[in-house]
Amino acid sequence: MAVSLMQQPDKVYDVIIIGAGPAGTTAAIYTARAGWKTLVLYRAEADGALGVTQKIENYPGVPGPLSGYELLKIMREQAKSFGAEFVRGKVIATDLNSDPKKVYTIDGREFRGKTIIVASGAMERANKFKGEEEFLGRGVSYCGVCDAAFFKDQPVAVIGDDDYAIEEAEFIARFANKVFFVVPGSKIKAPPEVIEHFEKLPNVEILLRHRPIEIVGDQVVKGIKLKDLEKKEEKLLEVNGVFIFLGGTKPSVDFLMGQVEMTEGDCIVVNEEMMTSVPGVFAAGDVLCNEVKQAVVAAAMGCKAALAVDKFLSGKKKIVPQW
């Protein structure tokens, strides 16, 4: 049977970490340093709540001020120095009951691991725009790589505010004749060099402080209504496609597909060793809906999850600390 080039059927990681914020990256430092083959899958360079924080001054051992993105880069370099592998890719599905466990990304890749640490944060949207669900698959999309080619030489809107949204918009701009990049806030949360490159694309128009109100059409999308927060007026963009890449505060756990125990608010339930209801699957960070949302707290949970993974993989009777 032919095997897709996007798969690596013979490569099995000891641990796959989903998310590269402080919890996921700290976990990677510990598992890689312990000698376990470690893969970290992350959605964007400025991943998670820390990645878009403008100034950090209270992270122990790191004199500030520095941006959350800069702090993440320091942590990732430390994890890489121990052998952790970082791969950019948005996780859309998992099979946690297979052996080994499987993780799938939006671009069609499959990764396999003996254990999983879910550290994907809490930045999903809880509420959808009017018309979003109605036109899903008929002009509304959450994947530029998947659907951009359907809008060749057509105008589209891309809704987002970070470097992940920019990356998707840049790909979409290869096909669409016009890309309106709609940002609800007053700024884009991405490294300056990324924004500068994006602004130079000839068929891209950035609309700051424009809040989406409604996606309109008949059988397919015909446009999107926006509220110009600067001029305090509504406008209609005539577009044939709307790509949505916005975040929120809801735990990012859709890819788990209900395979682990969660609360009504989609918070993952773990035991004292950070293990979920599925053996070999652990969780750390904001996916647990902690009352205190601080980078150092998330990092501590990532450490604890990593030590529990070490215990699980090695068959030890108790968690052994690292120094």
From Swiss-Prot:
The Gene Ontology terms for molecular function here are: thioredoxin-disulfide reductase (NADPH) activity
Q: Which Pfam families match?
A: Pyr_redox_2 (PF07992)
What is the cofactor note?
Answer: Binds 1 FAD per subunit.
Please state where this protein is localized: Cytoplasm
**Main enzyme class:** oxidoreductase
Instruction: Identify the residues that bind FAD.
Output: 42-49, 286-295
Main localization (coarse): cytoplasm
Disulfide-bond pairs as recorded: 143-146
Q: Which biological process, per GO, is one annotated for this protein?
A: cell redox homeostasis
Cofactors required? FAD
Q: What keywords does the record list, in alphabetical order?
A: Cytoplasm, Disulfide bond, FAD, Flavoprotein, NADP, Oxidoreductase, Redox-active center
Which EC number(s) does UniProt give?
1.8.1.9
Tell me what reaction this enzyme catalyses.
Answer: [thioredoxin]-dithiol + NADP(+) = [thioredoxin]-disulfide + NADPH + H(+)
Q: Name one GO cellular component term.
A: cytoplasm
Per UniProt, subunit arrangement is: Homodimer.
For this chain, the family text in UniProt reads: Belongs to the class-II pyridine nucleotide-disulfide oxidoreductase family.
Q: What else is known?
A: The active site is a redox-active disulfide bond.
Its protein name is Thioredoxin reductase
Species source reads Aquifex aeolicus (strain VF5)
Give the taxonomic lineage as stored in the record. Answer: Bacteria, Pseudomonadati, Aquificota, Aquificia, Aquificales
